[in-house]
């Protein structure tokens, strides 16, 4: 039989979907931007809209920045793991991210060096095994081996990269 295509969201020119997840059971969401900000906001502030609509603004974006991640925060979450394109990362205690309203810039989550950008703000418990994905390889790391530091610090190098290599993402390993 023929399959009907359903439009999930109306996108403006140049927009793309970064993440999608069910919100049932989650109270908070972490939204990260390329310039190193992370907004923790209540799922309740993101009102349901119809399928063929643009939706609501999650995070206010400064010029030349874009959303890199949007992840649910579970009750068991203890930290936000910030990871950059150049492989720097760290854990920051969740309580350092006071929940704010949507359509605000959030908190500076990591200090970026020239040319670096945030790849992900990943809510974690602190005992997970993670996979860092670069343009050339993957590296498994234990969350427990990543240093904890305040929000606006650089963190430490989590993966060795050669020229023209960069981090594209991080996921919790199964």
Mark where each language-model region is.
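Short, structured "edge-of-domain" segments at secondary-structure transitions
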Residues: 1-174
């Amino acid at each position: 039989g023929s399959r009907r295509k359903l439009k999930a969201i109306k996108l403006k020119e140049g927009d793309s979907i970064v993440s999608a997840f069910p919100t049932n059971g989650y109270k908070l969401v972490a939204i990260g931007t390329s310039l190193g900000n992370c907004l923790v906001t209540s799922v309740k502030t993101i009102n349901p809209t119809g399928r063929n609509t643009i939706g609501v603004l999650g995070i206010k974006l400064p010029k030349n920045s874009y959303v890199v991640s949007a992840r649910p925060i579970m009750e068991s979450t203890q930290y936000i793991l910030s990871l950059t394109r150049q492989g720097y990362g760290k854990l920051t205690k969740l309580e350092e991210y006071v929940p704010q309203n949507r359509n605000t810039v959030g908190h500076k989550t990591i200090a970026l060096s020239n040319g670096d950008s945030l790849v992900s703000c990943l809510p974690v418990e602190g005992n997970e095994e993670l996979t860092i994905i670069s343009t050339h390889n993957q590296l498994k790391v234990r969350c427990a081996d990543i240093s904890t530091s305040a929000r606006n610090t650089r963190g430490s190098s989590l993966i060795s990269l050669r020229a023209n290599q960069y981090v594209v993402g991080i996921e919790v390993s199964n």
